C-alpha cells in the first residue's frame, strides 16, 4: 500500500483539530483511520515511555483531554513533506475557568504499511501545576 497522498494528509490535518474541537469522537477516529488504519506508535513527548496501538495513542488520550482541550494549529506552522506532517500545536486547556496554552511540536510519519509513528515535543507540566491532574494520569510517574 502506498503512503497517504498530500491531499489525504491535508484533509486529515484539517480534520484533526476541527473534529476534536467539535467533540465528534467517531468522526475523529474515522479521520485517523482514513490515513493510518495500521499500527500506531507514539512518543508523547519524546523521552517518555512509548505508547502502542490506537487505543493508547489516540482513543484514551481523547477521552482524558477532549472535554478540557481545544486544539489550534496555525496554518503557518503546518508542514507536509512527503509522508510526514509536522506542526506547532497550541493546546488551549480550560482548567477551573482559566485558559492555559501549552505549545507542542508534533510530527506524524505515515508508512507504506499504513502505520504511523507520532513524536511530540513539549515540557511536561508538573503534577502540582493546574494541568497536573491530566498529565499525572496520562504520564504516570513522569508528571
Model-derived segments and spans:
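A beta-strand edge to alpha-helix "cap/lid" segment located at domain peripheries
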Residues: 3, 8, 63-143
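A short, structure-level motif marking secondary-structure boundaries and short turns
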Residues: 13-14, 46, 90
Amino acid at each position: 500500500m502506498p503512503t497517504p497522498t498530500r491531499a489525504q494528509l491535508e484533509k486529515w490535518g484539517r480534520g484533526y483539530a476541527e473534529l476534536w474541537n467539535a467533540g465528534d469522537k467517531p468522526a475523529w477516529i474515522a479521520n485517523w483511520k482514513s490515513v493510518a488504519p495500521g499500527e500506531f506508535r507514539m512518543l508523547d513527548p519524546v523521552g517518555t515511555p512509548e505508547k502502542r496501538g490506537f487505543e493508547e495513542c489516540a482513543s484514551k488520550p481523547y477521552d482524558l483531554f477532549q472535554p478540557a482541550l481545544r486544539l489550534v494549529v496555525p496554518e503557518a506552522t503546518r508542514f507536509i513533506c512527503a509522508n510526514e506532517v509536522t506542526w506547532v500545536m497550541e493546546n488551549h486547556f480550560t482548567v477551573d475557568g482559566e485558559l492555559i496554552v501549552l505549545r507542542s511540536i508534533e510530527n506524524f510519519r505515515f508508512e507504506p504499511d499504513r502505520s504511523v509513528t507520532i513524536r511530540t515535543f513539549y515540557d511536561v507540566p508538573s503534577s502540582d501545576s493546574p494541568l497536573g491532574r491530566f498529565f499525572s494520569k496520562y504520564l504516570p510517574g513522569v508528571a
